[in-house]
C-alpha cells in the first residue's frame, strides 16, 4: 500500500473523500493487468472494498492511463524529498492525471525513486527526460529501459533475470514476459514469441550470482 498526494500546496489541502487506486499488477489467469479508481468517504472506507485479484472492484472505474508514483518521503531519507519533489512537480505539470507523490518505495538510495502502475515496475535516478520517457513509453505499452530496476511482482533474483533477458532479447513490451521462475541460483524467463502470438513462448535460462544482485 502506498500513500499518495498531489505535488505542491494542492496536495496538502483537505479534500472531500479519498482517492483510491487499485493496481492489479498480476492476474491469476494470465490476462492483462489493469488499474482502477474509486472514491471512498474516508480511510475507514478502505475496509469496505472487496478487492480480488484480476476481478473488477465494485464501484470502481477502470483507467486507460498508468500511474507514476515518485517517492518524496523525506522522513525516510532526505534525498527522496530533495530529489523527488522537484521531479514530481515537473512531471505533474505535464501529466496531471498520471503523476503523484508517494510514501516510501524501495531503493531510497536510488533517489528519485519511482513506481509505475499497474505493472509495478520500479525506477531509480531518473532525469526529467527519462521520467517523461517512462510515462510516454508506458502509454504506448513499452517498458522504459533507462533507470528500470525491476518488476515488484518478482523476487529480487527474478527481477534481475527479467531485465537481463529483456536486454539480451531487446524486447520491452509491457506484456512480453509470460512468467519468471527462480530456483536457487537459476532463473527461467519465459517470453511470448512475438507480440501477436500468445500460444508460443521462448525460454531463457539465467545463472544468478546472488551476491551481485542489488534491486
Model-found features: residue ranges?
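Cofactor- and metal-binding active-site motifs of prokaryotic enzymes
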Residues: 1-63, 109-122, 126-128, 210
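Short amphipathic alpha-helical surface micro-motifs
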Residues: 2-4, 96-99
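Internal, well-folded beta-alpha domain core
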Residues: 66-67, 73-90, 98-209
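Conserved small/polar residues in nucleotide/adenosyl-binding loops
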Residues: 213-215
Amino acid at each position: 500500500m502506498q500513500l499518495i498526494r498531489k505535488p505542491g500546496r494542492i496536495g496538502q489541502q483537505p479534500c472531500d473523500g479519498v482517492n483510491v487506486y487499485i493496481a492489479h499488477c498480476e492476474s491469476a489467469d494470465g490476462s492483462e493487468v489493469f488499474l482502477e479508481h474509486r472514491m471512498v468517504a474516508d480511510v475507514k472506507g478502505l475496509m469496505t472494498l472487496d478487492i480480488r485479484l484480476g476481478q473488477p472492484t465494485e464501484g470502481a472505474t477502470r483507467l486507460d492511463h498508468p500511474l507514476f508514483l515518485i517517492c518524496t518521503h523525506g522522513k525516510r531519507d532526505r534525498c527522496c524529498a530533495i530529489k523527488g519533489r522537484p521531479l514530481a512537480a515537473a512531471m505533474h505539470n505535464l501529466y496531471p492525471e498520471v503523476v503523484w507523490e508517494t510514501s516510501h518505495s524501495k531503493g531510497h538510495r536510488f533517489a528519485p525513486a519511482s513506481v509505475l502502475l499497474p505493472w509495478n515496475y520500479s525506477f531509480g535516478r531518473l532525469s526529467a527526460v527519462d521520467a517523461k520517457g517512462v510515462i510516454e513509453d508506458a502509454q504506448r505499452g513499452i517498458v522504459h529501459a533507462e533507470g528500470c530496476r525491476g518488476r515488484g511482482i518478482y523476487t529480487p533474483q527474478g527481477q534481475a533475470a527479467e531485465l537481463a533477458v529483456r536486454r539480451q532479447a531487446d524486447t520491452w513490451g509491457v506484456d512480453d514476459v509470460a512468467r519468471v521462475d527462480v530456483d536457487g541460483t537459476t532463473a527461467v524467463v519465459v517470453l511470448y514469441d512475438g507480440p501477436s502470438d500468445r500460444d508460443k513462448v521462448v525460454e531463457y535460462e539465467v545463472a544468478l550470482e546472488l551476491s551481485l544482485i542489488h534491486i
